[in-house]
Amino acid sequence: MLIGILALQGDFFKHQEMLHSLGIETIQVKTRNELDFCDALIIPGGESTVMMRQLETTNLKELLVHFAIHKPVFGTCAGLILMSSHVQNSAMMPLGLLHIAVERNAFGRQVDSFQVDVSVYLKPGDEICFPAFFIRAPRIRTSETPVQILASYEGEPILVRQGHHLGASFHPELTVNPSIHLYFLEMVKENLENHKK
């Protein structure tokens, strides 16, 4: 299993550290050649408008959409914004991998960053207490079927899954708790097994 981490901008190295601690091989993705080797992709936090502009100028945007048809993608914070179907109050045209509408920086600016324990339900009836770090985090304003809500904060979704894609408005890579990354790895394994059949 080889997990790609989009490395155009943002905190991609923290995802690498988390996956390496779990014994998972990773590759920084900046070109099509690197993407072609990957079984899945993580889109990290960072500056969503800068990341989208770089995706467009490197011709990676359409390649990512095609990649995501058959392979899992996990986006955190800015990565969630890029994976959404609509960004409120923005001209950005996101990837459309998750049937959600988001609002950038809606949890506050950099000075308003905070950490809070949230209940995460990665399996039915199995509650995990997870330390969620919100840094200029987006809010998920609307979600549509078949989006599954795996965690909420103050009544709003903050961790969602749609098919073989996962998105978080917070930063699980900044904790020492690997639960959400392990969940994504299980999604990747399941996807690999399904494509062997």
Curated annotation (Swiss-Prot):
The keyword Flavoprotein does not apply. One of its GO terms (cellular component) is cytosol. InterPro entries: Class_I_gatase-like, PdxT/SNO, PdxT/SNO_CS. The keyword Acetylation does not apply. Pathway: Cofactor biosynthesis; pyridoxal 5'-phosphate biosynthesis. It catalyses: aldehydo-D-ribose 5-phosphate + D-glyceraldehyde 3-phosphate + L-glutamine = pyridoxal 5'-phosphate + L-glutamate + phosphate + 3 H2O + H(+); L-glutamine + H2O = L-glutamate + NH4(+). GO terms for biological process: glutamine catabolic process; pyridoxal phosphate biosynthetic process; pyridoxine metabolic process. The active site is at C77, H171, E173. PROSITE patterns: PDXT_SNO_1, PDXT_SNO_2. Its EC number is 4.3.3.6, 3.5.1.2. Keywords: Glutamine amidotransferase, Hydrolase, Lyase, Pyridoxal phosphate. SUPFAM superfamilies: Class I glutamine amidotransferase-like. L-glutamine binds at G46, E47, S48, R104, I135, R136. GO terms for molecular function: glutaminase activity; pyridoxal 5'-phosphate synthase (glutamine hydrolysing) activity. It holds the Pfam family SNO. Belongs to the glutaminase PdxT/SNO family. NCBIfam families: PLP_synth_Pdx2. Catalyzes the hydrolysis of glutamine to glutamate and ammonia as part of the biosynthesis of pyridoxal 5'-phosphate. The resulting ammonia molecule is channeled to the active site of PdxS. In the presence of PdxS, forms a dodecamer of heterodimers. Only shows activity in the heterodimer. This is Pyridoxal 5'-phosphate synthase subunit PdxT.
